[in-house]
């Protein structure tokens, strides 16, 4: 799955206007997370319960230095040595609208830099927004996190398409300052949410470092997942087109923090 943004520059945008249509070109980075997937096809069937709950299975992946056996555990060579097997390992996971929520981290359109409005906004229009629309229509909880505009003059407004979901009651907009981690976890427990699928910006900053971000949510009783095509990093000066920082961040997330989900896999399932 190629990342869908790299070096795609739009015309200058006023903060929070709708980004123009994006056309892919030869400068776009090719980063196929799933090229090494030689596993069998999984059943993409979506089932609907009597209560309207949708359930479906997705193939996810994570990287491990240690060999992972068929039971999902380690093979011990001795009391002090574990068999190694540097590789991606695949996990077929059951998701449902009852136990899975989507998180969109800081999808701002009022960054203090127009370039970031264009760069991250292009990703949102191409992948993040369509996925959230599909998730909401399927009955999934969609949670959008941002700063409280009462406390900040910028980095608060979310992109227009996501704001429309909030206005229509199809997504929740939560302010970071209102939701310390313990309160957020209690909310998830009350709503029966055990799985969190993360998207948003930036992958190497807020997505992992916020109190409700991936790194801080490890070990809190929730299964964590990340859709890298619905995110992008704060790159170095010379890597905006190649997305090298996002690639490295995705690897780190997939290695020790969350299982990765392919955008096309989950989008196609939810659109059924």
Q: What is each residue range found by the language model?
A:
Residues 1-6:
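Sec-dependent signal peptide recognition
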Residues 12-15:
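C-terminal motif of bacterial Sec signal peptides marking the signal peptidase cleavage site
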Residues 17-28:
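Short, low-complexity, disordered segments immediately C-terminal to signal peptides
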Residues 28-101, 118-119, 129-133, 137-138, ...:
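Active-site-adjacent betaalpha module
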Residues 103-117:
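Acidic/histidine-rich, surface-exposed loop or edge segments in extracytoplasmic proteins
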Residues 105, 141-147:
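Short beta-strand segments at enzyme active-site cores
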